[in-house]
């Protein structure tokens, strides 16, 4: 997993990406520019999209974009360059992970919430840049969405066992 990869990193920066996601052509370049400007953690807006653009997927996308679907994270809603509480698909200086330690391997999901909490405890900030955009495919069928949201809720509960403040 991530901890194995982090042990092998030889460069200055680490970019975390996940499944069901694609990026603007300048995604990596724009992340690197912000790191070169002195930021430790940087990312951009994550925009939910459909795969086939049919009416069923459009309806599920409306649900996904609500506060009940993807939540209230600033990286889904903000457009301006500012510090936010967390990021998806961020680029980190390698030294950040050296400072805060490895991912909690007991967490199969929501491990980034716990990791970001520890980063904030160490004083790191999360810069949202309007020049950085990622796109995440929303689930294309209702059963898939229900399964995903159930899993998210389950893992939030498990994560709270390890870190009660990482969702506040």
Where would I find each of the regions flagged by the language model?
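Glycine-rich, basic loop-to-helix element that forms the pyrophosphate-binding segment
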Residues: 1-9, 30, 87
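Short aromatic/hydrophobic "clamp" motif used to bind/position activated sugar donors
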Residues: 14
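The conserved acidic donor/metal-binding loop of glycosyltransferases
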Residues: 18-22
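Conserved donor NDP-sugar-binding/catalytic core segment of glycosyltransferases
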Residues: 25-58, 133
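Short, flexible, basic/aromatic active-site loop/helix in glycosyltransferases
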Residues: 44-48, 60-83, 89, 162
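Catalytic donor/gating beta->alpha subdomain of glycosyltransferases that bind UDP-sugars
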Residues: 50, 98, 104-167
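A recurrent flexible, glycine/aromatic-enriched loop bordering the glycosyltransferase active site
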Residues: 70-95, 108, 114, 134, ...
